[in-house]
Amino acid sequence: MPIKSDVKKGKGVKIPFPKLVNLYGCRLGKQVFVGPFVEIQKGVVIGEKSRVSSHSFICEGVEIGKEVFIAHGVMFINDKFSDSKKTGRGWKLRKTIVGDGVRIGSNATIFPVRIGKKSIIGAGAVVTKNVPPNSIVKGNPAK
């Protein structure tokens, strides 16, 4: 499992098991932690002091703020398919924006949305709509 040469890492980034991650063309801010069995795809930006726990998947088009905690097994999905537009080069992917200080519980699934700063996403939540700042959401769909 590779860390590609196009990955940009800020000072103090910690990847304790570099052979157990897939990182492609992403940008990791200062003091970011990436656990084992994580995949982070091209174009993803992760703000400083954020933590991505093991077995998580972060797809293209995701921007994560500073001091965000992503628990074990979180999946970011960048296409709802039902309302995506096909382009000449394939599907047009939608963005996901995660604000500073957000906490995302284990096994949550995050679709293309905006999650406001300091919000909490419960374990197992399926987030299909934007989350205002300072909110707590849980369930399927998350409310």
What are these regions (language model features)?
Residues K117-I120, A125-K129, P133-N134:
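Internal alpha/beta core interface subdomains
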Residues P2-D6, P16-L28, F33-I115, N140-A142:
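Flexible, glycine/small-residue-enriched loop-and-beta-strand segment within the central core
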Residues P133-K143:
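Conserved beta-strand-loop-alpha-helix hinge in the C-terminal portion
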